[in-house]
Amino acid sequence: MPEKDAMISFEEHKRQIEEYQKLFPFYQTYAKVLKGILEKACKTSFPEAFIQARPKAVSSFAEKVVRKYTKYRDPVNQFTDLCGARVIVQTLEQVEAVKLFIKANFKIVEEDEKGLQLGEDKFGYRDMHYIVQFRPDTFSLFDVTPEDQAAIGERKAEVQVRT
């Protein structure tokens, strides 16, 4: 169990950053493939969906390592958001459709449904967060190259879906 007030050493911080820098190209590939698949999923039914995906910036990773070190002693292997995607759609029905697509095509490691939130304007919005991994059949369904499949492997990504 990590000590509550433990701080990461300079050497360990540097090692974690260097390790992530080595893995960064794999997460760039992951983001590219993930965005492409989400775009294909949304293209016909709701082409106005806004989709973005990216790997976590090295500077953001470095900051998070320090901030979360008491909980994560091996961040490069424990963080689940080193690749992230966001899908923004216009209606709750579209959120549900994207949600079904994600559940049908990815292994869900973790799911956090923020539920129907009411803002000051009284319009409801849904905010879903998933930690996912690619399933092997998803690779073949979307013609992901063997090279990209190898780069992605069993890495995890965070996918947010919201209105």
Please report, for each region that a protein language model flagged, where it lies by residue.
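Nucleic-acid processing machinery
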Residues: M1-T163
